[in-house]
């Protein structure tokens, strides 16, 4: 199963003055953890990569991910929802999952406000995202998957929060090797 992580920018396709760019570390750790557990991974960082709708749609068709995990802070939540909307219009079979500070603080409200997100991950994401991807791969029900908000027959359901990871040493280093630092 192929999982693509997308680091969402503040705006899509508009020039924003940036003073520095940082590797999306949390997303890199999530993806490395998935790879460690047998998933094929990729990272699209639209904070540094050029974005056009046409190139994004083509990339969806070429790379054919099963799951896309969006990472967004509050200023970029509308950009994230725009990406989710494009995904649902052009590749509706892809499961769109979102995490990050905005949805972490407002998981249920975010599900109501942004209907194109299939699943919201809140709280510490590593074990939640792994379990979620494993359930989706095996076509298992999401009920009981701690740390998510999802829909059941159109109704928004918030599962219980997941306990914090006790041993952070079990997590791998971020998957920096999947990024082209040349550009």
Identify the meaning behind each predicted range.
Residues 7-13:
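Short polar catalytic/cofactor-binding loops
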Residues 2, 26, 33-167:
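Glycine-rich beta-alpha loop elements in corrinoid/cobalamin-binding modules
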Residues 22, 169-183:
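Radical SAM [4Fe-4S] cluster-binding motif and immediate context
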Residues 13-14, 78, 130, 181:
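Glycine/Thr-rich phosphate-binding loops of Rossmann-like dinucleotide-binding domains
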Residues 14-27:
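Glycine- and acidic-residue-enriched helix-capping/strand-helix junction motifs
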Residues 1-7:
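N-terminal hydrophobic or amphipathic helices/low-complexity stretches enriched
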């Amino acid at each position: 199963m192929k999982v693509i992580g997308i680091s969402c920018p503040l705006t899509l396709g508009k020039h924003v003055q940036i003073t520095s760019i940082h590797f999306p570390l949390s997303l890199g750790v999530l993806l490395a953890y998935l790879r460690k557990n047998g998933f094929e991974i990729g990272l699209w960082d639209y904070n540094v990569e050029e974005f056009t709708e046409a190139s994004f749609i083509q990339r969806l068709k070429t790379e054919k991910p099963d799951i896309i995990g969006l990472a967004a802070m509050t200023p970029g939540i509308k950009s994230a929802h725009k990406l989710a909307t494009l995904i649902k219009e052009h590749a509706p079979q892809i499961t769109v999952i979102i995490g990050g500070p905005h949805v972490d603080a407002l998981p249920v409200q975010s599900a109501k406000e942004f209907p194109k997100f299939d699943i919201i991950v809140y709280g510490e994401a590593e074990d939640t995202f792994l379990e979620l991807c494993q359930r989706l791969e095996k076509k298992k029900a999401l009920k009981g998957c701690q740390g998510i908000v999802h829909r059941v027959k159109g109704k928004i359901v918030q599962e219980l929060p997941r306990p914090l990871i006790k041993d952070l040493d079990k997590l791998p280093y971020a998957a920096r090797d999947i990024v082209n630092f040349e550009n």
